[in-house]
Amino acid sequence: MKYVLTLVALAFLVFSAQPSEAVEALHTYDSMKEDTQELASQYPEIAIYSEQGISTGLDLEIFSVDVALNITELSDEELHALPTMYVDGTHHGNEGMSAEASFLFLQDVLQRSAADPSYLEGKRLVVTPSVNPDGYVLDCRSNWNGVDLNRNYPYMWGMYGTSDTPNFCPVSGTYRGASEGSEIETQVNMEFMRNMNLYVYFSAHTGSNDIVLPWKITGEFAVPIADWELYEYFLNESANVSGLTYRDPGGAGESIAWGYGARAALSLIVEVDDMQWSPLVSTTIRGALSNELLMYDLAWENLELVGGHLQIIDETYNSVTLQNIGWGAAYNVTAGNEIVEKVERNQIITIPKNSNFLQYNRLIHEGEEADLTLISMNLTSIQNPENGDTPSIGFISASLTLLAIVTSRKRNDYNN
């Protein structure tokens, strides 16, 4: 019956479209895989196509593209250290436009980076168009086992908005799985994300046009988001460019709850379109996703600002002056003995320097590993000039200036 309805919808879209309108077909799983491989191959110096695992029922590859400047020359350690934005699609297999959004964003970043390498400098993008290949092929929300993969993640698993009964195609449901993280697709995605220095995680879905928070912050089961100042700032900036508003999620155990809760990344579902199962759009795919792609661009182009981001303004032998230019607060700031618990956005502070390193946390939420948000910066090695050691930068500068003045005066005396 569902496929009959699909044919009817196809006919309706084709015949109802105006002559000036394009009717564009969405990718299938096979064409998405082929086009993604081809896209990565066009940019061999900055992109690598890889396969992370195999789906539960049809043994289909869960494939990704990794993007970084001079990526083939980077060690695994260097690659994993880069601030990273991760984008995925089709946790729900019948939400084809979510895969399209992921693919188009990947395409945009590759094209811009090829034209201007600075667009990619110092950061990493990873894109997985389809987390649920079986559902993508079968046009089903659930995976082969009838599990809603976006209710299967360990963080807050089963708390609300889930079912304890499997749902097989064509029936859609919210079955959370037999246990948290029970599904192969979920496990593959989590393991993949653990190899990233995640700053931002966007999981694309369809069914509405808005942004979904990692967990409920209002009503029953509400839990505060520790880094809400950062979330609120980003969401306001996003609304300015995309017009998208935000809301609480409908269920627990979602991938973004795990992305923020376990991996300490700014994690959001982007509901890119209200269409779910139709294989066509009555406009261009890019046109339908234009506002959502602006939100992706915003996050990517400001990736290092997602959280606290301290900039050194001045440094002497015994102090360092810093400004937080990030979109969130910085925490536990120290250059030795003294610790400043919080530095607000745009705040300037001067702290004592008893070390050659500056350290701080760019988020207050830690995640499953204590050092996930830890930032370390090298400071200039300068000792106290009063002890006869290496003078400060300011002292050296003043000495050179004085020497220049004396030399100039002597020359003037000779000339006179």
What does each model-found stretch correspond to?
Residues M1-A22, M377, S381-N416:
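Secretory targeting signatures
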Residues A25, M159, S163-N387:
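C-terminal accessory segments enriched in acidic
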Residues T28-M32, I54-L60, E95-S102, G181-E185, ...:
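Phosphate/oxyanion-binding active-site loops and adjacent basic polyanion-contact surfaces
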Residues A47-G53, A114-G122, Y246-R247:
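Surface-exposed patches in mature extracellular/periplasmic domains of secreted proteins
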Residues S64-H80, T90:
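Short beta-strand-to-loop junctions in surface cap/lid or active-site-entrance loops
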